[in-house]
């Protein structure tokens, strides 16, 4: 869970991760994340990049099989001026 949140928080296009859930199955894990995206970014591109990075890094760092990564964009953050 912490690895997934750290990956998202290091992406400039992601404002905040609001929820993360990891379910462990016998043959691997499933990750569910909700995030707020910064205004001006293509949501689909950001979510695809986050999904790929999360799967790759968790498999690399933990040697666990990631079965799926489900992402939900819960909102858009607009900078206050």
Residue ranges and their predicted role:
Residues 18, 41-45, 81:
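Short acidic, gly/pro-rich beta-turn/loop elements at beta-sheet edges
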Residues 30-48:
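A short interface-forming secondary-structure element
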Residues 4, 43-65:
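Short, non-transmembrane amphipathic alpha-helical segments
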Residues 7-10, 36, 57-59:
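Preference for short coil/turn "hinge" residues that link or interrupt alpha-helices
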Residues 1-6, 10-14:
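N-terminal, polar/charged subdomain of small-to-medium soluble alpha/beta proteins
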Residues 11-36, 73-78:
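Short edge beta-strands and adjacent turn/loop segments
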Residues 49, 78-81:
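A domain-level signal for the structural core that forms small-molecule/cofactor-binding pockets
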Residues 60-78:
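A short amphipathic beta-strand at an alpha->beta junction
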């Amino acid at each position: 869970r912490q690895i997934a949140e750290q990956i998202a928080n290091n992406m400039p296009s992601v404002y905040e991760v609001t929820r993360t859930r990891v379910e462990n199955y016998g043959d691997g894990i499933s990750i569910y994340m909700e995030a707020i995206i910064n205004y001006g970014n293509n949501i689909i591109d950001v979510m695809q990049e986050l999904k790929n990075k999360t799967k790759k890094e968790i498999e690399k760092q933990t040697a666990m099989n990631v079965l799926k990564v489900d992402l939900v964009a819960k909102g858009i953050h607009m900078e206050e001026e």
